[in-house]
Amino acid sequence: MRFGAHVRAGTTLLPAIARAEAIGADVVQVFTQSPRAWKPTQYYPEILAAYREATDRHPGGLPTFCHATYLINLASPDPERFSLSTSCLAANLAVARAIGAKGLVLHAGSHLGAGFDTCLAQVAEALVDALEATGDSATVAAACPILIENTAGAGGTVGRSLDELTRLLEAAGDLSLIHI
């Protein structure tokens, strides 16, 4: 069994490895950018490659999971907010894929009181579009699937029950692309 933690990655991601080692973690989760900002961190390709190589060289490997920024709301009825969300998700997924992450954890967002059924198709389509924006969706998902994290169920959150998560996966059309 592996034990891990979400650790601060800094601006180069590389400090996450030392932080994981310092606490004895053998799996790690990091944000690919500030969790409360739209602007993605611009990493040099050499940094992404160095992170991937360092985790591959780690004794036993150091599986990495990334967590998408909290601002993403794939259920937003506001076209501008939805556009920001889909762009941000694609950017987060691209970084996760580049560092060899095993998955990108995502809170799908909130329907803002409109109801889950109202946003279901939009959210499912946005998830598949993000995978396709970063390459062949099946190839990306095999290496780095989107992992929908359940929510506490407050307000209009999407994915607050097993039923909602199941329906979201089914609406996405290919259960190999997206996981919970």
Q: PLM features: what roles do these ranges have?
A:
Residues 74-176:
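Active-site acidic/histidine proton-transfer and metal-coordination neighborhood
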Residues 179-180:
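Conserved small/polar residues in nucleotide/adenosyl-binding loops
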Residues 1-68, 72, 76-91:
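N-terminal pre-domain/capping segments
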